[in-house]
Amino acid sequence: MKRTTLILLSTFCLLISACGTSSAAGPEKTVEAYLNALNEKDSTRLSTLSCADWEATALMELDSFQAVSTTLEGLTCAQTGTDGANALVTCQGKIVASYNGELQEFDLSARTYIAENSTGEWLVCGAQ
């Protein structure tokens, strides 16, 4: 009886630990995190989520939002294709920027993000 309980408990613990070590988030979750970091004006997180070649562009985009208040509305992203080893991700929703009471909306569906998984984690590496 003790042996059966021990085996069942060990199996249960193994299954629980396997659930906790799922693979890294997909490219769509990385793009969502990237856009959230942009909205929250988190340059450190934005850099972490960007490829080295895209980082300067990402930080330039961030600079363009520094003087305005932003909100992110209706964000959902999905992988819509591939380009070689890269994933193509499109998003729905918008960034609404407010400056001196004037609102400007940036439609997120106007761009397709390019995500790359060359380091074991998905990173945003461009947009088209």
What function would you assign to each model-found segment?
Residues 81-128:
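Exposed beta-sheet edge and beta->alpha loop/turn motif
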Residues 29, 43-88, 92, 99-100:
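Short solvent-exposed beta->alpha transition segments
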Residues 11-12:
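Repetitive helical segments and hydrophobic/amphipathic motifs
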Residues 15-18:
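C-terminal motif of bacterial Sec signal peptides marking the signal peptidase cleavage site
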Residues 24-31, 39, 104, 108:
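Solvent-exposed, acidic/flexible segments
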Residues 20-22:
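Bacterial signal peptide processing site
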Residues 1-5:
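Positively charged n-region of N-terminal signal peptides that target proteins for export
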